[in-house]
Every structure is written in structure tokens, then in C-alpha cells.
């Protein structure tokens, strides 16, 4: 009976230790990964990492939620019709998404490693048309993001 109690307490200690280690790992990984980003986009008076620069671009950061490793960086123009979302990957590198809001419609695209847009819905002719129309805006947002966050 005493051996059974000892085993239960050992199991509980192991479980608590694993959970504590997971929390510590999450905290260190996300803090280190996002440190260089939040340094250049500090929290505003509302506690949000948001910065509007004089050039009309708005930069924001969403750090990963508790025990999640997925956060994002975002940049949009002043009229907020075009936005670039950047997902820093834990393993290194980034994934990009581009969003256009025009005439009450939203068009979303993946951005590949060569900075080319690919519509999420490849069968949507309007999205393909917008993709061609907004190439310069994507290039400008990518350039601003790379300059701001040293990507």
C-alpha cells in the first residue's frame, strides 16, 4: 500500500514537472522569437503592439497565446484595404499571407518563397484578377515589413 502511494506521488511529481517544463519552454521560445519584433513595435497606451508610422503604414504584432507557438506580424496601409500577415515559424523562416478588402469583398492569398501570390480559392476568377491588380501593393508591403522587422 505504501509503495502504491509512493508511485502515485512520483507520477504526480513527474506530471507537474513535465507541465512546468512545457510552460518554461513555451515562455522562453516565444519570448526569444518575438523579442526583436516587439522591440521595434512597442505596446501602445492600450497594451497592444501597434504602431502607425508617418508614412501611413500600420504595424502590429500578435504574440502567441498561452502554450501556443503561433503568433503573427501584420502591416497594412492607412486605408486598411491591403494587409500582409507574417507568421514567424518556430523552426525558422516565415509564412506570408496577403489580404485585399475591396467593395465589401475580401480576397486572400498565400505568398510563396519567391514573393508570388497564390489565391486560396484558385477557381475564383475575381481573386485571380485582384492578384494581378495588387502585385505592386504586395511588393511595397513586403519591402516595408522586411525593413521594419529585418526579415
Residue ranges and their predicted role:
Residues 3-6, 19-94:
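N-terminal export/targeting and maturation segments
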Residues 9-18:
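Hydrophobic H-region at the start of alpha-helical membrane spans
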Residues 56-151:
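Extracytoplasmic electrostatic interaction patches
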